[in-house]
Amino acid sequence: ELSVAKLLEKLKVDDIKHQYYFYGDDTISVNKELYNFLETNVPYLISMVSSDFSKITLADIKEDNAEEEIIIPDPAHEPTIGVIDTLFDENVYFGNWVENVDYLDEIEKLMDKGKDRTHGTAISSIIVDGPRLNPWLDDGCGRFKVRHFGVCAERISTVKLMKKIKEIIANNSDIHVWNLSLGTDDEVSKNFISYDAAVLDELQAQKNIVFVISGTNDNRSTKNGILRVGSPADSLNSIVVNSVRRDGTPASYSRKGNILSFFNKPDVSYYGGDYNERIKVYTSNGEMNEYGTSFAAPWISRKLCYLIDVVGLPREVAKALIIDSAAGWEYKLGAYKNKDILGYGVIPIDISRILSSESREIRFIVYGTSQSYKTTNYAIPVPRDDENKYPYIARATMCYFPDCSRAQGVDYTNRELSMKFGRVKPNGQIDDINENIQDEEGLHADERQSRKEFRKWENTKFISKVLKANRPIVSYGERLWGISVISKERLSSQMEKDLNFGAVITLREVNGINRIEDFIKACTLRGWIVSEIDVENQIDVYNTNQEEIVFD
């Protein structure tokens, strides 16, 4: 098989006249003349075409002319969120909280000299001090430090942006959460993932990071139908955020998924304002009012960083908690009808609502590694009522970060983890709450059913069992409840590496009885070590770990 490099050499392409750049083994960036030459002589070579420019769309801005001096304490041990955006103005009141890097080459510095720094500064203002600017959006997460990489002033080519992001990630391994509020006006393809989204997915499969990406805006003056999202909002491993108004309805500029006609994007929604109810930000010009998905995403970056860096949860569990809190019990009851625009739903404002559960609920976290075909734990002692029945409705959310292959088109993800959760039947099989019959002997689910009903090949799984009559379900003798995670590889190669997954499971007592202590006791008797998440204690642990020890 002839490589692309050898083919270009064989075609006698003049690399001085026609400059081109390789990004991986099968992706090149070319100018228009070379593209036309290749299209004429080797049309089979061009299987996927990406738009060359990511245009950063700035929302309408309304000045607030606030002149009062704002006092902010110096940063201490707060965690750091990475921001990749337009340039940052170091002269704003929270400048000490931002480690700013103008990530520009010499030519870009000359071209961008004196350019506007509004957008990038506004994004970092939400991450650092968003609750002070918008008291009604106080999430209880406090302030965050920012490492801000200004990669452009207004426009940047997709391949150049991704090259910069690769370098930035490689040199800043201490940061786990990255905010990317940039995107294209062009709709993503129905047939393949965009180049920039594929790069972000690859980075997240390889490294312990999560990108939070804005769902992009519809900036047309006349809207004829709803546009699909622009890249890189088709990134599968990232958390893609769309925007809603204060009442939870989609913003007027909302764009939609799904991706490749299947994958659920956006993931979630949050408050990003609208033309007549804007979000307060701070820029070089003082306080301003803006709207857009760009200003919804940073709030989710705050929550995600809090869960990972302060509470100490793995990224897979943190993402599952975010998704689960958005879906709640309402998703299966009808909210799923708006999934193309709202994703799994609107995330609660207060972080405590993500980390806590109601008194009648039992919620627990499972974090594990898929090392083989099946990863199973059957010993989950769910409490029964006086009639020896299980008086619960249940839901579960699982997230993982698989390797992906853009060249496979719609068959994008390489690895599938299928989850079952429910009562263990006498034959040892799990009576799954989602009636998942995949991989059961004697039963068959075709590919269409597996994708539609069980979300096969999707890296976020949400399953729920809601009993309309709220009747308790029978127990199978002394059997317990179980979790089964089954791994499948799309490609013919064997599974070469372990894949971490995080699951959040919630049981709600239909009669409103608090059975959490019974659950903890039963788990302890079976040898489980049960650790309740104490947020205040985790904050103390985090602060202690950040203290510097000076040896005499």
Model-derived features with residue positions:
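Extended low-complexity, serine/threonine- and proline-enriched intrinsically disordered segments
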Residues: 1-11, 393-456
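Autoinhibitory propeptides
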Residues: 1-73
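Subtilisin-like serine protease catalytic core
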Residues: 70-102, 110-159, 206-208, 235-237, ...
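Extracellular S/T/G-rich loop segment that most often corresponds to the catalytic His/Ser-adjacent loop
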Residues: 87-95, 228-305
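Substrate-binding/access-modulating region of protease and related hydrolase catalytic domains
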Residues: 151-231, 290-291, 295-296
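C-terminal subdomain of the subtilisin-like protease fold in secreted/lumenal serine endopeptidases
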Residues: 311-391
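Extended, solvent-exposed segments with strong compositional bias
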Residues: 355-367, 428-475, 489-494
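C-terminal edge strands of extracellular/lumenal beta-sandwich accessory domains
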Residues: 412-426, 472-473, 477-552
